Amino acid sequence: MASEGITEIDSGLIESNYDNVVYKFDDLNLKPNIVRGIFGYGYETPSAIQQRAILPITEGRDVLAQAQSGTGKTATFTISALQRIDENEKSTQALILAPTRELALQIKNVITSIGLYLNVTVHASIGGTSMSDDIEAFKSGVQIVVGTPGRVFDMIERRYFRTDKVKMFILDEADEMLSSGFKEQIYNIFRLLPETTQVVLLSATMPQDVLEVTTKFMNNPVRILVKKDELTLEGIKQYFINVEVEDYKFDCLVDLYDSISVTQAVIFCNTRSKVEFLTNKLREQKFTVSAIHADLPQGERDTIMKEFRSGSSRILISTDLLARGIDVQQVSLVINYDLPANKENYIHRIGRGGRFGRKGVAINFVTDKDVGMMREIEKFYSTQITEMPADIGSLFA
């Protein structure tokens, strides 16, 4: 089924060296109880990435899959892992790594939901939680482990997590996972897995340095790559407001909120101190605001996310911690109070706004100093960020 080079599929929107595209879940040769779980989770037909990636993963092939946020890539490897798990073997068979605790917990929840009718155990091994709970889970036997690199490596090194039966190693958000901050930890974990372990990498962006690193991990991988000019999510309208200087941003934000009616919004800042500053200023103006950043205790972060999901908080202010994988369905507006320092995080941020075709708006506050960075982002994604129109209220009508 694999052909020699990269061939274009689906009017050139997706490139792949694997030519088997499956358009129905019923045709993927999945366990009946997985199909039952898929339909129960709300899927009716596979998304583009699911049509192309599930089959080679379930066949045991190494897969490098690129799909933007909101296309169902988490379910892609969830379905595949559940298919490959031997329910009678109680050892850990699949290891899934994610860059943040929040994303790891979200993945665990998706696995639990889709695997509802299977006899499969899943555990989140993440920093900021009880070490004793982790140890107990590994001692009792867990078949799928979702975790963050630091805690997972610690559990392996302490010999609570036995890796001899691991047959799948999945890295979600690979561009982040293989960045300088995680690369060494990933390598350390990889060296402790069986040589025959299948490797699956999924991400929204695949910079060249990441593609080069995959040669160290993977054996003749199936490549499913979205063309760079297709990375921006459909349904997300992108605008900028030229605020000239940093000091004008806050007044601009308040004016913006006076002009529009939005159910919920996420506002991104680049630093914890900026998040705290903006949160306090908005509360002084009587806005209902929540804030989240990496330095908050895990329990507090969970509570904040729960409140925002329930709708009791209308505005969530965050660092890039939230940009990777938190699924908040009601969000129609994302505001980049600061443009991301790393242009590859831009798509993760604006991807909060319109998942699975839901319409969304992204508004970027741009100082005179930021114009160059905004042009770089446009070039990187082959997209256009247009100036905010005068009648902005019509965008949210």
Curated annotation (Swiss-Prot):
SMART domains hit by this protein: DEXDc, HELICc
Self-association and partners: Component of the eIF4F complex, which composition varies with external and internal environmental conditions. It is composed of at least eIF4A, eIF4E and eIF4G.
Name listed for the protein in its UniProt record: ATP-dependent RNA helicase eIF4A
Motif placement: Q motif: 23-51
UniProt keyword terms in alphabetical order: ATP-binding, Cytoplasm, Helicase, Hydrolase, Initiation factor, Nucleotide-binding, Protein biosynthesis, RNA-binding
Top EC category: hydrolase
E.C. no: 3.6.4.13
Compartment(s): Cytoplasm
Domain (Helicase C-terminal): residue spans on this chain: 255-396
Catalytic activity: ATP + H2O = ADP + phosphate + H(+)
Family (UniProt): Belongs to the DEAD box helicase family. eIF4A subfamily.
Residue ranges annotated for the Helicase ATP-binding domain, each copy included: 54-224
Motif (DEAD box): 172-175
Binding sites annotated in the UniProt record for ATP: A67, Q68, S69, G70, T71, G72, K73, T74
One GO cellular component, as annotated: cytoplasm
Annotated gene: TIF1
UniProt-listed PROSITE patterns: DEAD_ATP_HELICASE (PS00039), HELICASE_ATP_BIND_1 (PS51192), HELICASE_CTER (PS51194), Q_MOTIF (PS51195)
Function noted in UniProt: ATP-dependent RNA helicase which is a subunit of the eIF4F complex involved in cap recognition and is required for mRNA binding to ribosome. In the current model of translation initiation, eIF4A unwinds RNA secondary structures in the 5'-UTR of mRNAs which is necessary to allow efficient binding of the small ribosomal subunit, and subsequent scanning for the initiator codon.
PANTHER family: ATP-DEPENDENT RNA HELICASE DBP3
Domains: entry comment: The Q motif is unique to and characteristic of the DEAD box family of RNA helicases and controls ATP binding and hydrolysis.
GO MF annotation: an example: ATP binding
